[in-house]
Amino acid sequence: METLSSVGKRIPKRDAVDKVTGRAAYIQDLKVPGMLYGKILRSKYPHARIVRIDTSKAKKLLGVRAVITAEDVPQIRYGFIKDQPVLKSGKVRSYRDELAAVAATDPEIAEEAIHLIEVEYEALPGVFDPMEAMKPDAPLIHEENKSNILKIPWKLVAGDVQEARKTSAFVAEDEFEVTWVTHCCLGTEGMIADFDLRNNLTVHRNTQIPSLAHRDFKDALKVMGFPDAKVRIIKPTIGGGFGSKLDTYGFEYIAILLAFVTRKPVKITRTREEEFRYTSTRQPAMMKIAQGCDKEGKLTFRDISMILDNGAYTSWGATTPSVMMMPISSLYKVPNVRYEAKCVYTNNTWSQAMRGYGNPQATFAIESNMEQLAQASGIDPLEFRLRNANEPGEVTPQRFKVTSCALKECIEEVGKRLDWGSKKKGPKVEGRGIGMASLIHVGGGARVYKSDGCGTIVKVDDFGNVDVFTGATDIGQGADTIIGQLVAEEMGVLPEDVNIIDRDTDVCPWDVGVHASRTTFVAGNSAVMAARKVREKILDLAAGFVDRWKDKQGNKHEMKLDDDPKNLVIKDRMVYSVKEPEKKIALGKILRGAHYEKNGTMIMAEAFYDPDNENLDKEFKGNLSKAYAYGAHGVEVEVDKETGKVKILRYVAAHDVGRAINPMLLEGQIYGAAAMGVGYALTERLILEKGEVMNPNFRDYKLLTAKDVIPVEPVIVESMDEAGPYGAKGIGEPGLVPSAPAIANAIYDALGIRLKKLPMTPERVLKAIKEKK
């Protein structure tokens, strides 16, 4: 294996010191001269006609600079299918609906003004259950649609499921259900909007999609009558995303409108309670599944149908069925597949991208049912998975082209570390059980848009310091650190010589955004390409460079390394001759020569990497990603039969990552994702009653805390993907995908009880124990 100096090293995150010392500036820390503060009035009803809005009292309050409703401003619409106006008129469809907004000299005055706005409503019947919402006589959320079923036909068919079911030796079928959970980023959302005298807009926003937000805000300016105005987005330090910042929201456009009306910068940030109430969630789903296998335990078919709660409007959450198709069609070798999903409008909150993007929901059903099918066939669950595991070179029913794949190795690692065979065959300890589940996720980008690309500009100064302008966004996952290591490796410099600039759309290249675990693969490849061009430029210069100096006696000397740049290397801030390693010249000296010599040149280069993956066609088939990430998680649990509490004794997480660019950050991703997955499985639930969030705080929303940290054992399996930067694949999302089914399977092994609804709280476990008795 090649010897590497930066790649594969356990280098701390670049922003770690700034964060722990309080130097990092988040959106909450930013203040612009003359800034006003915005607040938003939202609906008191989940479904109602708006009869009247009276803002007169709010406008009279000292310190208020503007009050706006839908009647006062252009009607900007947003969302995946643009079904949502920024400020509502006519009627409201959820408690999240924005009716009016205030800009004032301080947040307290703005809050007081909001309470002075009077709204008269005419309540309408609400519908909060997707099954009820599909009935012919259900209240319509959007009357113009004539139905509450979203007109996006999520359907995938490959092979003949009906015939395969008839010929299967064993069939297992069941129903599973998952509910709302939310992102719980430590950094809540916020934005500052500021116009100059030419109506150009500058935005400070903690977003995952600066380039796409730039496009959306540009469209908003067109609606406002300024098609030629410019948009600039500056990102502060971002305290987590997990998909929550993968779209533009109403509050952003409201900040823009208030800034335009007042001609002052306007800042809107969310409180923690507002974050719980008004941030989009993971999409709830009701899932029916059937799978079959032959006598040898080889899968014959998989058949799944789903009903998903779309909420009152359509955000990116409505597209999660496109990712649910991935494990349904391509987790294990399954020749015949059928999948259909319906997204249904209700008066509940609407959903958004969230880490895993539909994959955790689908995998919970698939891997719980795989356990049932293994039991029906009489085959050990681990062996059953090995018999059906994906392999390199495979083309799945959805036409995914599997390149690197170490799923079998991951399953075997879980079995070995949990001592699977002995625990399954030996005497059982009461209340204890082991379980496992596998995963597939995109690991080489995902062509959701027309482009899946990312740009990079690399520039070197006189002294060998490297500036990398990347389109990628660091939202806490360590993208800056990884890109720095890749560039350092490619150029032969030290990681500390590399500076990453990723905060400003005026200077940074275009990128489609932080989603689909794509940053290491796509932005990494882009950075490597640009760095390689710069390295080649430097070596070309070095080949023609003559080093001249005088010794202490005043004698002149000169040296040339080699006429052929292929015989030169950069290492530790020096350029060396490969043939004569004792011959070396300081990198900075060569670079200064390029700038000061006659006919000098700039040492910089750009690259744009767009993987040759495919958009899914009308049948939802195509090679969505350039590479696929695989993994398997194994869990040992202990269940208290008196309380129903599930204690995780061991948690093994084996991941095929291609190559670990930074094992320490990679392990951190696995730790964090597994903790999020365990929360999804056991504790987390956003409780809605008739559309209203009932637990909008960390006291009542049971997020795992430091005292609940599980004993995760990360296992890194390197399959070396030929298309990845130095062999790497994405890892950001996969680590939470199989947690819930692995735990559910372990609980079944411990108690003989199959839990089919998340979260598997002590109350639900205890109820199941009592029902079994």
Located regions from the model:
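Short Gly/Pro-enriched turn/cap motifs at secondary-structure boundaries
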Residues: 11, 90-92, 181-184, 279-282, ...
